[in-house]
């Protein structure tokens, strides 16, 4: 899980090595993270078997867009997987995100169309070498926190370990995910805490997943709930999520405030 080496902003950027020379990438970060992400992929062999997108916020899909615009052909991508709502929905709900949707769709036009899989559905299984990826939902259209709640959740199973990525799912999206799946049956080992560790899914989602390890795509200021006035000065709910992880007995927390996080 990559930290933001370019700004202090939050992001979600994960590279999974499948062990057979291939990679799975989850989101990737901002446009200004492009060079770092690209170099990390190249250092790991340059072959992305599956690039998974949770939702089209700039801090998640910007880097992929600019890799396709500015570095097309420098790495191999076998498949890009995503579920977006209609352009008109983003235009109505969040014009800034609508701009990013248009931007990344423009980038999609530069690659072979057979690698684009924008039609993923709940329950679909994607094979990436020895890794098995389960799509847990299509983009939800909730009546609040619209774009975050449209996040696709994925479970990546590799070497006997199940990792659930929640993207930026918020409370109602998490409730819908619980309605759609028996989350306890997923046998989750590792969870990416939703929405950078605050104001994401509710406690019941984590309780059902019962992870032993938590991945925090959370910069220092957000971890500390620091709006510039010191620890605890902000309005973010990070401490609540930390408390949940303690209640659930999570025994390891990996956070990008400490730099790139490697789990082997």
Where on the chain are the PLM-derived regions?
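Binuclear metal-ion centers of metallo-dependent hydrolases, dominated by the metallo-beta-lactamase
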Residues: 74-148, 213, 218-264
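Short amphipathic alpha-helical segments
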Residues: 37-39, 64-66, 94, 177-179, ...
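Solvent-exposed polar/charged
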Residues: 207-208, 247
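Core dinuclear metal-dependent hydrolase active-site scaffold
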Residues: 1-46, 113-185, 262-264
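Second-shell loop/turn segments in exported
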Residues: 26-30, 48-53, 87-94, 140, ...
């Amino acid at each position: 899980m990559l930290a933001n080496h370019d700004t202090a902003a939050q992001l979600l950027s994960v590279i999974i090595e499948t062990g057979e020379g291939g990679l799975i990438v989850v989101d990737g970060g901002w446009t200004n993270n492009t060079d770092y992400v690209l170099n990390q992929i190249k250092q790991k062999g340059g072959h992305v078997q599956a690039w998974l997108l949770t939702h089209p916020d700039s801090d998640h899909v910007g880097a992929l867009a600019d890799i396709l615009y500015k570095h097309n052909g420098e790495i191999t991508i076998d498949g890009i997987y995503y579920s977006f709502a209609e352009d008109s929905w983003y235009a109505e709900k969040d014009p800034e995100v609508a701009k990013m949707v248009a931007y990344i769709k423009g980038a999609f036009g530069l690659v072979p169309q057979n690698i684009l899989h924008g039609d993923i559905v709940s329950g679909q299984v994607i094979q990436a070498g020895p890794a098995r990826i389960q799509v847990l939902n299509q983009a939800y259209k909730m009546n609040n926190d619209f774009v975050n709640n449209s996040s696709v959740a994925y479970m990546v199973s590799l070497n006997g370990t199940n990792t659930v990525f929640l993207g930026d799912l918020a409370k109602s999206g998490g409730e819908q995910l619980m309605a759609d799946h028996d989350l306890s049956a997923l046998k989750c080992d590792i969870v990416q805490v939703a929405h950078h560790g605050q104001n994401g899914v509710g406690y019941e989602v984590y309780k059902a997943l019962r992870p032993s390890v938590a991945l925090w795509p959370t910069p220092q200021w957000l971890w500390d709930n620091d709006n510039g006035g010191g620890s605890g000065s902000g309005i973010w709910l990070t401490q609540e999520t930390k408390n949940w992880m303690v209640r659930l007995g999570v025994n390891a927390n990996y956070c990008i405030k400490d730099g790139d996080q490697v789990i082997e």
